[in-house]
Amino acid sequence: MYGDGDYRRFWGLRVLAVDGSKVALPDTEDVRAEFGTIAYSGGKDNEIQGERPWALASVLYDVLNRVALDAALGEARAYEVELALGRLAHTREGDLLLMDRNDPSYRMLAEGVRAGREFVVRGSAASFATARRMLRGEGPDRQTVTLEPCDGQRADIQARGLPMAVRVRFVRVLLPTGEFEVLATSLLDEAKYPAAGFLELYHLRWGVEGFYGVLKTRLGLENFTGTGAEAVRQDCHATVYLTGLESILTADALAALDAKETRHAQQVNRAVSFNAIKNQALGLLMGGMEAGPLLERLTELFLQNPTLVRKERKPPRKKPSDRALLDFHRRRKKHCF
């Protein structure tokens, strides 16, 4: 895919989302010692108290080509920005990093500048002063400013050899809900990177949220095959690898569906694709079958029962009750096993 340059880009850049997510782990002494725990409470008057092991996953995900380039599991209380910085080593020139509002620290931006990577980061109400003012609706929609570390960070930034000043462009976009969103970016050229395109660009970040959904629901990541720390890591990396394999194997089927003239765009049904790969994976990976006929058969299966893409469909987000979630996971959730 990347070797021959035949992959999707936005503004000529490979778009990579960096994001973290909590992963529930088996409750064993080995896992507790390796990853740590997080306390929980619940019930009326919080009479239910306890703690259980978790990990913080960090993924570098190509949102346009649906491939995870790198993934790591950190401790339960790991700093998400620190984990995200570890993914920089797996990027290259011509990459654009999309990051959520958990990541807009000066160090994150400075590390991106030092590595020569472009970035777009969503600003929060607790981030840079310019972003806070723009979120309140103050000032122009586009501002280019020079950021410097605060007094508490200055010594650490200097010790790390990071730039003490970073030139950043802030772009304010209006969401369909009527709310403002402020994005901080290293893409300073307004002619080459017009402000009107940033809403579409940042919306691509939802691809990594969907990726975590596939890992945790469709592939049942948290249903681990072992109870030790090493088994947890192996399951995590095997599951991420499987998603990349699925993306590569379904590329021809996706191209065929894109070429069809239909009312709504179509895409491969991932319940079908993962099930087909599961049944044929050993023959494909172990070399027990001829690759050509096997890939043709898989493509035929991938083209069955495609799902429709309705971009204009925006159902309201709901927060289900614990009872509804338990019912879903026990009785309704579809697995690819």
Residues covered by each model-derived region:
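Single, function-defining residue in the core of a domain
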Residues: G5-R14, V18-F337
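Short, basic alpha-helical nucleic acid-contact segments in DNA-binding proteins
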Residues: M1-Y2
